[in-house]
Amino acid sequence: CLTLKPMVQKLQKNYSVGRVIVVADKGLNTGKNIVYQKAIGNGYVMSLSIRGANQELKDFVLNEDGYEYNQDKTYKKKSRLYPREVEYVKTVNGKPVKAKTTVDEKQVIFWSADYAKRAKAERQLAIDKARDLIGNVKKYNKKNCYGASKYVKHLVFDKNTGEIIEAKSQLSLDEDKIAEEEKLDGYYAIVTSEMKKTDSEIIDIYRG
């Protein structure tokens, strides 16, 4: 997995800086990176995938309790202090061993009407492609239907060629999946070690 360790080590060594707050997107939000930064006294502000999160976090995000709105209701935010279990690899007797630990974090959730519109528009392109796939199966394979295939029920690919295998059941649009995704349009989650900072400060740090 991607690691921030070499980058941060070089920064702190070359510029003789003290404690730093590492800002990263969800691709670098790994247990390994978080455990390392905390171990050397650094902080972090990282985005977290809501769609890939557990149901508890999704429920918290969709629960209206605690949200603060702007005047025209196009933006809202809330937060909580919450312990999160992360997985990482540690070395025991010279061998890598999988381990888990709990980190205390502040989770900041925000929603933007503009982000929601953008997500809906981007998904609609994939849905249109999925509909075309259903009606014109021979035009597509695993490679050229990327992004759309997840919205098609009963779709099966040949593991070797990537070609679409004739399904036992008729292909159809996965309306339930689309509806579930729509619920989370426009929402973003940020996790941070900086629990004393305000929600707005955390969001500003993440946005740079």
Named regions from a protein language model:
Residues 1-208:
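Anion-binding and metal-coordination hotspots
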